[in-house]
Amino acid sequence: MRYGGNTSCVSIDAPGERPLLLDMGTGLRYYGKRVDPDHLFQGSCLLTHLHWDHVQGLPFFAPLLREGSSLDVYGPAQTDGRTLDEVVSSTIRPPLFPVSVDELPGDVRFHDTADTDFEIGAFKVKARLIPHLGPTLGFRVEWNGRSLAYLSDHQQPCDGSFSVTPGAFDLVDGVDLLIHDAQYTPPEFAVKATWGHCTIDYAVWLAEKAKVKQLALYHHDPSRRDDDLDALLSCAVESGAQHGVDVIAASEGLVVELA
């Protein structure tokens, strides 16, 4: 598979800064293999929401198997009153998993987050609630004049029209790189309009509207074959080029440098 098969996880690396991760899907295990084993991992994660494909990698993140390692997780506050810690910990414990989060040698700290701006080291982070199923955040990260927005799961209007909430637009406006949900084609969306995602066409439209420099199509449908993605990407590239947006498809191990 050229595009890969793990679920959502992106790493942001900047000189002099601790690692900043976006989501903790099964790709987190893959990322863990890249971490220098001679150094204790100390980093942070911006968690969009609590669906399994965004948290499954946490108990398999090998760097947390060392005492002294740490991961600060910033994710959406829940509407039922439970904390982020309570919800994640309820899924990673016996009998669902051999050990609990508290039993990991490393330290995992959870921070309930809503519509807010904050800093992690020199990273300036903007979090905004965006449409999806359940409390979901999108993020904008700025560092040294560079900017990235991450909207991994983003519900397009269910009637198939193109519009965007003020919070979501606030995240993507003028960014250097937009990593955006691009799960469906229009015929697929017509059948799954309430499933919390959007079309590739919508992602390209939003990038054009927000004057984004580069769009990375993300959260590919799991049934998609490599050749299918190639064809869909080709159409998106052509559409983006008409409005000055460079369109790429996210793939496992892809590195994008922001100048």
Model feature map: region roles:
Residues 1-149, 159, 169, 229-259:
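Binuclear metal-dependent hydrolase catalytic cores
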Residues 130-131, 142-144, 153-155, 182-184, ...:
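Histidine- and/or cysteine-centered catalytic micro-motif in compact active-site loops
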Residues 148-155, 189:
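Short, basic, glycine/proline-bearing loop/turn elements
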Residues 22, 48, 150-152, 180-182, ...:
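Active-site flanking residues adjacent to catalytic metal/cofactor-binding acidic residues
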Residues 157-251:
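Cap/insert and terminal regions of metallo-dependent hydrolase folds
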